[in-house]
């Protein structure tokens, strides 16, 4: 290639689009922080003993067009067939109004978890709708705002049953007609928490001495059975019963709640979310009100704001890992908010009648199929069903299955049987094609007429739903596309996302989610593949996954990867299981002590508790580093039982610890393993790596470092990388291995496979040099912000050369003592300036942790710094008595349009100062839609379902 062609190449175009500051601005920033060059800054920041000796070996960067062309080649290797496998995954139509306005809309997918409710009312409303939808359809009393998948929801239900129940048994019963992938995930959870799992026939449940039970309704083979009597008898034995159910089936079938179930779980996938080779999808959990404080996951509740107006918020957060740590109900952090929102909107758009029509059509097609097969001489395994039938095919099973494959049709193979699951996409032509496979000559139209005479004959009369559902106006209003489009936009406009400005959340890495990275996720070649389709039909996924694993191994210095975990917390869980299985394989299963620094993420101790580890906290010194003397003492005390240490690097204090290699060596010398939490991997890529540092296992947050969007609280992915000695202990899957020996942590082998293309695309378009440069720019941005704010705010931790890593912690505690203004007041006031708050009170109470990422440009960094400096000046006015502590722009923040237009203004500052505090806000303004939300009121008056329409009107 000539020099001119090289200079005109688009090969590295994406790097400049991903990184915020252009080269000239980087130079200005370096001068401002007194650094000679970017590389000099890195040398001052990252300890020399952990710097990589050689660049990463990765392919050269691709242009956006070249990346998409390569991605299309992966996609073409996948074969989209007509799939009737079922087993919890179904074809579905994603309404285009939802596809375009939600899934493909950065206003929805780039938002963060709604910890700041004043700027999150849109998605909070949608998630509340999700909860109401689940409550109504399952017949339960309270629901959460999504879990990772149906299988992990079942595992969470098991632990809920133990916490909430009164039985002294240590055995959990699982009916043998539960989805196989669910059974395996439950077995994994049970083994490491010390429970025994008993798999048996449903009929045997009442006679078992068990603390909890899991049953499937309809069953995995499609059978519909009345569970009322079995549930009552089990409960008489102090057994809490969980029913795994299907939301679409619940529109026609008597729901689990009306049969007396204690817990209902399942997947909302078929409500408009593509199968995606296994995910991501929103699972759900609903239970009785009395169990609400033992229920895992985020719960949206109704509260009021400072003016007494209705406002939504995340309720009962004291149950969660970021507060209760090892005593939390679960380690779940990231859930599936974006997918829950899609399912919620699907229900809003179709409404009760629309959903019932879809269910009737699906059931009618199934009834036609069943009638035709019966007339054709085939015997059904059961005559009651909703959308799934199982045919006794005996010796013909393999021949019929092969014939189906030849006709591009996927069926489910069972011993001596074939399963067929229909869905909303099933057509008359599909039924005719299925008849052809089985040699049935019946006419579909004639069968339809015959079946219509008793439309619900396959549903026992006692199991036909009579109760109403989705009666709230939100499910009965937005049924035209115009109405729906406007409703989606109204909710979107209430929320702050990356489309509005920087989200400087420390330890969250809210970087760019580029449009080019997002495009492939809606391609049918990725979306329409069933996770249990024959492997040859998913060759594209296999090739993509193999290449991504190789890239991640190179980036991390590990030898093997599993893509199965659906979140960072799930990755931690899989990693600790790998460590414990490794110890067991060496006859050292007694090693159960996990050392965790006091600065650790809340998920770390919560996860360690989930694998029955004893958590021992290691102190940090005044500089934010692990206290080496305390570590040595704790290792010595527990050396015989030491399993592992969980560290984060750079530490959650925002510094590169100089002695991290020494920490690893000390733990290894005592027979322990090192788990390096990958939450801060964005400050390692290309400069160092977990494997080089000396770690044995890490999870990576693909929704942080590798650009999968946060989605307002999920999806996420937490694949784990390991050194070779731990590779045999990565999670397996029932589809690939020996039943009972898989230690699966997710329902599908590749977890949330359909979003893997995002991370692959990011790595491909950045290349080695681009990835390394992104890390350097992230460090530059953080140090620039730190240096601009340091004259005004105390910075809590810095490295030995006065530098920070990719984030910095601002200490508000002395300022609060001086002025009376808290970190929460600053966080809320930042909303008036057009910003999402930094991370509050983590890892140190009374602080703000700022992470700008590499994607923010100099103008945005300056806008943020100017806002923070202006807020500091406002704090000084409070201190000096110009404004009273109980009435000033900070404690009254955020300000709304209603405040601006109110007739009375009883405040000692102007409306302009309150609502337009900076020059930037006068040219463009994001408006919070509620005043400060009352958290205490919300938890004391807990309402987790849609409020009356009158409340909206008020």
Swiss-Prot record:
Cysteines paired by S-S bonds: none
Any single GO CC term annotated in Swiss-Prot or TrEMBL for this entry: glycine cleavage complex
NCBIfam families: gcvP
Positions of modified residues (N6-(pyridoxal phosphate)lysine): 704
One biological process term in Gene Ontology: glycine decarboxylation via glycine cleavage system
Cofactor(s) the record lists: pyridoxal 5'-phosphate
Any Pfam family hit: GcvP2_C
Biological role: The glycine cleavage system catalyzes the degradation of glycine. The P protein binds the alpha-amino group of glycine through its pyridoxal phosphate cofactor; CO(2) is released and the remaining methylamine moiety is then transferred to the lipoamide cofactor of the H protein.
Protein name: Glycine dehydrogenase (decarboxylating)
Signal sequence bounds: none
An example molecular function term from Gene Ontology annotations: glycine dehydrogenase (decarboxylating) activity
Catalysed reactions, semicolon-separated: N(6)-[(R)-lipoyl]-L-lysyl-[glycine-cleavage complex H protein] + glycine + H(+) = N(6)-[(R)-S(8)-aminomethyldihydrolipoyl]-L-lysyl-[glycine-cleavage complex H protein] + CO2
E.C. no: 1.4.4.2
């Amino acid at each position: 290639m000539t020099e001119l062609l090289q200079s005109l190449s688009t090969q590295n175009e994406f790097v400049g689009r991903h990184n915020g500051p252009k080269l000239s601005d980087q130079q200005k920033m370096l001068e401002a922080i007194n650094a000679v060059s970017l590389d000099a800054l890195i040398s001052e920041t990252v300890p020399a003993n952990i710097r990589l000796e050689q660049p990463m070996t990765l392919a050269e960067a691709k242009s956006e067009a070249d990346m998409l062309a390569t991605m299309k080649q992966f996609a073409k290797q996948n074969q989209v067939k007509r799939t009737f496998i079922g087993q919890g995954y179904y074809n579905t139509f994603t309404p285009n109004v939802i596809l375009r306005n939600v899934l493909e809309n950065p206003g929805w997918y780039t938002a963060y978890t709604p910890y700041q409710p004043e700027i999150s009312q849109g998605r909070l409303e949608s998630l509340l709708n999700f909860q109401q939808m689940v409550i109504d359809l399952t017949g339960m009393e309270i629901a959460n705002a999504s879990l990772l998948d149906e299988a992990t929801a079942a595992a969470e239900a098991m632990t809920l049953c133990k916490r909430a129940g009164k039985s002294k048994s240590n055995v959990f019963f699982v009916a043998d007609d539960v989805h196989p992938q669910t059974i395996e995930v439950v077995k994994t959870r049970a083994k490491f928490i010390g429970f025994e799992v008993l798999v048996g026939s449903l009929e045997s449940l009442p006679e078992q001495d068990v603390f909890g039970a899991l049953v499937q309704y309809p069953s995995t083979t499609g059978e519909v059975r009345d569970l009322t009597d079995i549930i009552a008898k089990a409960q008489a034995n102090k057994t809490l019963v969980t029913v795994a159910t299907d939301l679409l089936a619940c529109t026609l079938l008597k729901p689990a709640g009306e049969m007396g179930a204690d817990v209902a779980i399942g997947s909302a996938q078929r409500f408009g979310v593509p199968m995606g080779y296994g995910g991501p999808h929103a699972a759900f959990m609903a239970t009785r009100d009395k169990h609400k404080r033992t229920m895992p996951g985020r719960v949206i509740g109704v509260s009021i704001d400072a003016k007494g107006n209705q406002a939504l918020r995340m309720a009962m957060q004291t149950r969660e890992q970021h507060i209760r740590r090892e005593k939390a109900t679960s380690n779940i952090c990231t859930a599936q908010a974006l997918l829950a929102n899609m399912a919620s909107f699907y229900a809003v758009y179709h409404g009760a009648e629309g959903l019932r029509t879809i269910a009737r059509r699906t059931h009618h097609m199934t009834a036609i199929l069943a009638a035709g097969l019966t007339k054709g001489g085939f015997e059904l395994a059961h005559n009651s069903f909703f959308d799934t039938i199982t045919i006794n095919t005996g010796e013909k099973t393999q021949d019929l299955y092969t014939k189906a494959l030849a006709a591009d049709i996927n069926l489910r193979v069972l011993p001596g049987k074939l399963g067929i699951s229909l869905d909303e996409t099933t057509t008359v032509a599909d039924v005719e094609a299925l008849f052809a496979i089985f040699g049935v000559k019946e006419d579909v139209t004639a069968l339809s007429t015959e079946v219509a005479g008793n439309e619900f004959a396959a549903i026992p009369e006692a199991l036909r739903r009579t109760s109403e559902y989705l009666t709230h106006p939100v499910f009965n209003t937005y049924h035209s596309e115009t109405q729906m489009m406007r409703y989606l936009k109204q909710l979107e406009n209430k929320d702050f996302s990356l489309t509005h400005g920087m989200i400087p959340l420390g330890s969250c890495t809210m970087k760019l989610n580029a449009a080019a990275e997002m495009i492939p996720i809606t391609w049918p070649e990725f979306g329409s593949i069933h996770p249990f389709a024959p492997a040859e039909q998913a060759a594209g996924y296999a090739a993509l996954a193999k290449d991504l694993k190789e890239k991640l191994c190179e980036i991390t210095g590990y030898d093997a990867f599993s893509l199965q975990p659906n979140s960072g917390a799930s990755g931690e869980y899989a990693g600790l299981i790998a460590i414990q299985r490794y110890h067991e394989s060496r006859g050292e299963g007694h090693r159960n002590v996990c050392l965790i620094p006091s600065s650790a993420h809340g998920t770390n101790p919560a996860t360690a508790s989930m694998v029955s580890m004893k958590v021992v906290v290691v102190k940090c010194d005044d500089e934010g580093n692990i206290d080496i003397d305390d570590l040595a003492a704790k290792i010595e005390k527990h050396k015989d039982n030491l399993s592992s240490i969980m560290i984060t690097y750079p530490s959650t204090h925002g510094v590169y610890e100089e002695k991290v290699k020494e920490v690893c060596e000390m733990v290894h010398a005592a027979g322990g393993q090192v788990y390096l939490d990958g939450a801060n991997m964005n400050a390692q890529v290309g400069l160092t790596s977990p494997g080089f540092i000396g770690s044995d296992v890490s999870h990576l947050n693909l929704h942080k470092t590798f650009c999968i969007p946060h989605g307002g609280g999920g999806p996420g992915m937490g694949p784990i990388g390991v050194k070779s000695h731990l590779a045999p202990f990565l999670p397996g899957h029932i589809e690939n291995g020996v039943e009972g020996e898989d230690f699966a942590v997710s329902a599908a082998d590749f977890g949330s496979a359909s979003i893997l293309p995002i991370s692959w695309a990011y790595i491909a378009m950045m290349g080695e040099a681009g990835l390394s440069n992104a890390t350097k720019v992230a460090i530059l941005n953080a140090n620039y912000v730190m240096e601009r704010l340091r004259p005004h705010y105390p910075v809590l931790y810095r490295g030995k050369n006065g530098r920070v890593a990719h984030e910095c912690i601002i200490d508000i505690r002395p300022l609060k003592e001086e002025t009376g203004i808290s970190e929460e007041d600053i966080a809320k006031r930042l909303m008036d300036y057009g910003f999402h708050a930094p991370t509050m009170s983590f890892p140190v109470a009374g602080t703000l942790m700022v992470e700008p990422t590499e994607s923010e440009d100099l103008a945005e960094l300056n806008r943020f710094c100017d806002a923070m400096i202006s807020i500091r000046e406002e704090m000084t006015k409070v201190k000096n008595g110009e404004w009273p502590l109980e009435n000033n722009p900070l404690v009254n923040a955020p300000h709304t349009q209603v405040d601006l237009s109110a007739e009375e203004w009883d405040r000692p500052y102007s409306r302009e100062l309150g609502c337009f505090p900076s020059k930037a806000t006068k040219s463009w303004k994001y408006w919070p839609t509620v005043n400060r939300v009352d958290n205490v009121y919300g938890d004391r008056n807990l309402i987790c379902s849609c409020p009356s329409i009158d409340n909206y009107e008020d």
